[in-house]
From Swiss-Prot:
GO terms for cellular component: cytoplasm; ribonuclease MRP complex; ribonuclease P complex. The keyword Cell inner membrane does not apply. Pfam families: RNase_P-MRP_p29. InterPro entries: RNase_P/MRP_Rpp29-subunit, RNase_P/MRP_Rpp29_sf, RNP1, Rof/RNase_P-like, Rpp29/RNP1. One of its GO terms (biological process) is rRNA processing. It catalyses: Endonucleolytic cleavage of RNA, removing 5'-extranucleotides from tRNA precursor. Keywords: Cytoplasm, Endonuclease, Hydrolase, Nuclease, tRNA processing. Its main location: cytoplasm. Its EC number is 3.1.26.5. This is Ribonuclease P protein component 1. Belongs to the eukaryotic/archaeal RNase P protein component 1 family. It comes from Methanobrevibacter smithii (strain ATCC 35061 / DSM 861 / OCM 144 / PS).
Length: 92
């Protein structure tokens, strides 16, 4: 089960997300995560409209299945998803 405390150790694909702070204002978007790489998150914002957001310099707000919202700095997510799941993070 995904919780606020273990979100960074789970897959983001399928979660609702909004990008609240980014260097490019046109990338302030809200949608569903459909893919993730080491440096980017791909979001489906409308039907069949996909946007690629750089992780570095962005702030993401993920909505968990329970309805809770979690804000995460994209700079700490800039590692491969499969490595992030295994990595231990310091409490923030």
């Amino acid at each position: 089960m995904i919780t606020v405390n273990n979100l960074v150790h789970h897959e983001f694909i399928g979660l609702s997300v909004s990008v609240t702070s980014v260097s490019n204002e046109s990338l302030r978007l809200k949608g569903t995560v459909i893919d993730e790489t080491k440096n980017t998150i791909k979001i489906e914002v409308d039907d069949n409209v996909e946007k690629i957001i750089p992780k570095k310099g962005s702030i993401f707000v993920f909505e968990l299945p329970t309805g809770e919202k979690v804000e995460i700095n994209g700079n700490i997510l800039s590692i491969r998803p499969e490595d992030r799941i295994k990595k231990r993070f310091k409490k923030i």
